[in-house]
Swiss-Prot record:
InterPro entries, per database record: Metallo-B-lactamas, RibonucZ/Hydroxyglut_hydro, RNase_Z/BN
UniProt GO molecular function: 3'-tRNA processing endoribonuclease activity; zinc ion binding
EC numbers: 3.1.26.11
Provenance organism: Metallosphaera sedula (strain ATCC 51363 / DSM 5348 / JCM 9185 / NBRC 15509 / TH2)
Function: Zinc phosphodiesterase, which displays some tRNA 3'-processing endonuclease activity. Probably involved in tRNA maturation, by removing a 3'-trailer from precursor tRNA.
Keyword tRNA processing among record annotations: yes
Protein name, UniProt field: Ribonuclease Z
Family the UniProt entry places it in: Belongs to the RNase Z family.
Family matches, as Gene3D superfamilies: Ribonuclease Z/Hydroxyacylglutathione hydrolase-like
Source organism, top-level taxon: Archaea
Encoding gene, per UniProt annotation: rnz
């Protein structure tokens, strides 16, 4: 099971919604996607332990997505963190942090590693290109598929040799009597959970192709229908819903809500006309995803 926490679902100017921050958790692994101003305060006040964050993935260097990161890292240092922190992000992120730390007289006292992708404990985090007004990337969080052997079927067919079963599970074909046992005939594949987060983006083919079939898509929905979001490199609710429909995702979270909207009911209504499995998460809500 994966758990997605919607820490900050707003964007741009502060509002009743926090600035962008989304936490994905699975069995001891915590991945923070974007870190707007105030992220660590919200997490600490709501018992989301910042020290458990293993990976931080930043989409781009606009202030509302990244300015909470230097202070979060400094707090981790003050709490005497020892574990390595992995950071993914666009070009310039490392320089931004280095200069901020120098000018605020802080030197990280735990290992920080900047990586282009991350894989551990059966989870992979990798970027995909988005369509914003500055260099920007979204992220896929993917759980590996698992394969279990249909031992009952094998027994019915008289195959009980554990060595044969092991070879089939390893994906190898096995000669058996006058035929060949093929692994695809006896393996039951359980598809892993897949989550996609766009950060800020226009609707575009690169995003659609990257998020095909995910279980949950968190897509920029800054404005309601009727506003030209292209000038700002953002999307409307109907544009986000169209991406979700074309990419055949399972669920759509409308995020990065502009501060101008206190009531998102019309935004949600617009999206659901196109993609019924849309929702607008509130700050500090969460969603459990099961394969």
């Amino acid at each position: 099971m994966m758990k997605v926490y919607f820490i900050g679902t707003g964007g741009g100017a502060p509002s009743r919604r926090g600035l962008p921050a989304y936490l994905v958790r699975r069995e001891g692994l915590s991945i923070l996607m974007d870190c707007g101003e105030g992220t660590q305060i919200t997490m600490i006040r709501n018992s989301l332990n910042i020290m458990n964050v293993n990976v931080i993935a930043i989409t781009h260097l606009h202030a509302d997505h990244v300015l909470g990161l230097p202070s979060l890292i400094q707090t981790m240092g003050m709490y005497d963190r020892k574990e390595r922190l992995y950071i993914l992000g666009p070009e310039g992120l490392k320089d931004l942090l280095t200069e901020t730390f120098e000018r605020t007289y802080f030197s990280p006292n735990f290992p920080i590693e900047f990586v282009s992708s991350y894989e551990s404990q059966g989870i992979r985090v990798r970027p995909f290109r988005t369509c914003h007004v500055v260099p920007s990337q979204g992220y896929l969080v993917e759980e590996k598929d698992t394969a279990n052997l249909d031992a009952e079927r094998l027994r019915r067919e008289g195959v009980t040799d554990w060595r044969v079963m092991r070879m089939l599970k390893e994906g190898k074909e096995v000669p058996w009597g006058d035929r060949v046992l093929k692994p695809e005939d006896y393996l039951i594949v359980k598809r892993g959970i897949r989550i996609a987060y766009t950060g800020d983006t226009r609707p575009c083919e690169t995003v659609i192709n990257s998020v095909k079939g995910v279980d949950l898509l968190l897509h920029d929905s800054t404005f309601e229908q009727g506003i030209d979001a292209s000038e700002y490199g953002h999307s409307t609710s109907t544009e986000a819903a169209t991406v979700a429909r074309e990419a055949e995702v399972k669920r759509l979270a409308l995020i990065h809500i502009s501060a101008r909207y206190r009531d998102t009911s019309e935004m949600l209504k617009q999206a659901r006309r196109i993609f019924p499995m849309s929702f607008v998460p509130e700050d500090l809500s969460f969603l459990n995803l099961r394969a």
